[in-house]
Amino acid sequence: MKITAVIPIRSGSQRVKDKNLRAFADTNLMELKIKNLLQVPELTSIVVNTNSELAIEIVNKSYRGGVTTHRREEYYASSQCSGSEFFRHLGEVTDTDLFVYCPCTSPFIKPETVSQCINQFISTSDYDCLATVSSV
């Protein structure tokens, strides 16, 4: 079974410009997410789905072969695109059996948690999606 982590990076963030690529400690949110996902043995591939030239440049320079990019069409990076449309589009353009949606804005999800979620999901056919939540 091919399991792909999809990291969405939108260059036109409305509230914080390039938030996923801004300095965060000694790295940035995208690279932190990639480093965490590279530790998840269940993943067969990691794809950064983006319309950001800078994100593509960083991935191509720093993660040759280990991480790929998919250049997102501008419509799917716009505020006109609904969440449902975006997820349908991800399913259509991601060559995989199962995709794991991994936004950079959740930087503290541990690799072990991602592994547990994948294993929980593939161990049953009762569900078609799974989400992580925290009690507050």
Indicate residue ranges for each PLM-predicted region.
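Short, well-formed alpha-helical segments that are part of the catalytic scaffolds
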Residues: 16-39
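Short beta-strand/turn micro-motifs composed of small residues
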Residues: 9, 50, 131-133
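Hydrophobic/aromatic residues located in beta-strands of well-ordered beta-sheets
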Residues: 5, 46-48, 129
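Conserved core of the sugar-phosphate nucleotidyltransferase
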Residues: 79, 85-86, 98, 106-136
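N-terminal nucleotide-binding beta1-loop-alpha1 segment
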Residues: 1-17
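Conserved N-terminal catalytic core of the sugar/cofactor nucleotidyltransferase
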Residues: 31-95
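Catalytic metal- and UDP-sugar-binding loop of GT-A-like glycosyltransferases, i.e.
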Residues: 102
